Amino acid sequence: MKTHSLRWSFCSTARTGKPNNSKQRLRKGLLLVIRKVAPISVAAIFYALEVSITRKLKNYTPTRFMEKTSHYDVDAADYAVMFIESLCHTKGTWARKPFELIDWQEQIIRDIFGVLKPNGYRQFNTAYIEIPKKQGKSELAAAVALLLTCGDGEERAEVYGCAADRQQASIVFNVAADMVRMCPALSKRVKILDSQKRLIYQPTGSIYQVLSADVGNKHGFNTHGVVFDELHTQPNRKLFDVMTKGSGDARMQPLYFLITTAGNDTKSICYEIHQKAKDIIEGRK
């Protein structure tokens, strides 16, 4: 089945300068965002868009890579943004303060959740985000996981938090659990099973569950969402393939949210995706 794809590049030249090659891009923190859309056309089409990071999105413009048959649903986008901004930061001086999305974060959320196909389902179903350290990666990933679990209107949604090991995967989970505890509306409806690293949204029977790179029993999922944290640390591509190839076929709009800081293993699945994004951005695909 053929797919469309969208590639974004967010490059903070003020902080890093513009890197000249892929290794520099990995070292200096080029922000690459890839989105793979639901099957539409005969040939895979890839796009690239470069956006600078600013404090707050002043005027949102829907991605120019929206399909002609798709549309921007402002209500759907506003809902996603408002859901996330009803959550709180969980650590340090920002703890318990509202999670106000900054420019590049809001652009991502509005394009993912606001660009819809004629049937009302999301056009884009995969996001790859590569960002420097200390840019709020865990908070954004946790917020997206909660939105997919609790706010996406999906019955019995299965949302999985994946990483190289259970400890790494638990980082985003722990942030999500704290966000739930700080949100009265969610804390009344979500059961937190810390020992199992599982959240249950009781009104729909939906779950958010931590998984690690041990793929021996990682089959048979009916995935509505996957949040892959620190993709560059995956020891191989097995977990990535299990969780992204076919696991969401029974869902109408699964979302694979891949987020990572930079790595240097040129044989990793993360580098493979990074290179695909680089090719798209530089017009080779």
Predicted regions and their residues:
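Phosphate/NTP-binding elements of NTP-utilizing enzymes
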Residues: 1-5, 10-17, 21-25, 29-285
